[in-house]
Amino acid sequence: NEAFSRAFVGLMRTIAPDTFIFCMGASATYGVAREMGQPVVREFYADRGYNLDGTIVFARSVNRFDNKTVAEKVVRACREGKVQTDDGEDIDIGFESICVHSDTPGATELLETIRAALKANGIAVAPVSQTG
């Protein structure tokens, strides 16, 4: 919602102008933050499906994922900048951060699997402040 994003980013510009906002690249918040000069980081949601427009599939309940499959999805997104949507189509995806939600069953183990897969594929993990 653009009106909410403008209010939120405007408030952030007032109280925390150097604080990163983490959000979907395909969101109004991302566009508004860039327009208003607020530091913004696009997130890749490892534990969520994607729609054709690059937004995530919102689920009322989160199922346990196959950790290896999710890790492969993350590695592919890092290497190729692509993710397969829930419709089976590949879309471009740009991001600077990888998110796993804490309410995802087995989130800790999933993160460990993702981290190991990134390391095995020579993909560095670094603080956002060091990603350029």
Model-found features: residue ranges?
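Short, well-ordered coil/turn segments that N-cap beta-strands
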Residues: 17-19, 38, 94-96
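Flexible, glycine/charged-enriched surface loops at secondary-structure junctions
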Residues: 18, 81-92, 124-131
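Active-site rim beta-loop-alpha module in soluble metabolic enzymes
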Residues: 28-82
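Conserved, mostly hydrophobic/aromatic
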Residues: 100
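Anion (oxyanion) recognition and catalysis
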Residues: 13, 34, 119
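N-terminal active-site wall of soluble small-molecule enzyme domains
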Residues: 1-13, 28
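C-terminal domain-boundary segment and adjacent tail
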Residues: 109-132
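Catalytic beta/alpha-barrel core
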Residues: 12-25
